[in-house]
Design a protein with these regions (language model features):
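Flexible, glycine/charged-enriched surface loops at secondary-structure junctions
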Residues: 18, 81-92, 124-131
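Conserved, mostly hydrophobic/aromatic
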Residues: 100
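Active-site rim beta-loop-alpha module in soluble metabolic enzymes
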Residues: 28-82
Length: 132
């Protein structure tokens, strides 16, 4: 919602102008933050499906994922900048951060699997402040 994003980013510009906002690249918040000069980081949601427009599939309940499959999805997104949507189509995806939600069953183990897969594929993990 653009009106909410403008209010939120405007408030952030007032109280925390150097604080990163983490959000979907395909969101109004991302566009508004860039327009208003607020530091913004696009997130890749490892534990969520994607729609054709690059937004995530919102689920009322989160199922346990196959950790290896999710890790492969993350590695592919890092290497190729692509993710397969829930419709089976590949879309471009740009991001600077990888998110796993804490309410995802087995989130800790999933993160460990993702981290190991990134390391095995020579993909560095670094603080956002060091990603350029």
């Amino acid at each position: 919602n653009e009106a909410f994003s403008r209010a939120f980013v405007g408030l952030m510009r007032t109280i925390a102008p150097d604080t990163f906002i983490f959000c979907m690249g395909a969101s109004a918040t991302y566009g508004v933050a860039r327009e208003m000069g607020q530091p913004v980081v696009r997130e890749f949601y490892a534990d969520r499906g994607y729609n054709l427009d690059g937004t995530i599939v919102f689920a009322r309940s989160v199922n346990r994922f196959d950790n290896k499959t999710v890790a492969e999805k993350v590695v592919r997104a890092c290497r190729e900048g692509k993710v397969q949507t829930d419709d089976g189509e590949d879309i471009d995806i740009g991001f600077e951060s990888i998110c796993v939600h804490s309410d995802t069953p087995g989130a800790t183990e999933l993160l460990e699997t993702i981290r190991a897969a990134l390391k095995a594929n020579g993909i560095a993990v670094a603080p956002v402040s060091q990603t350029g």
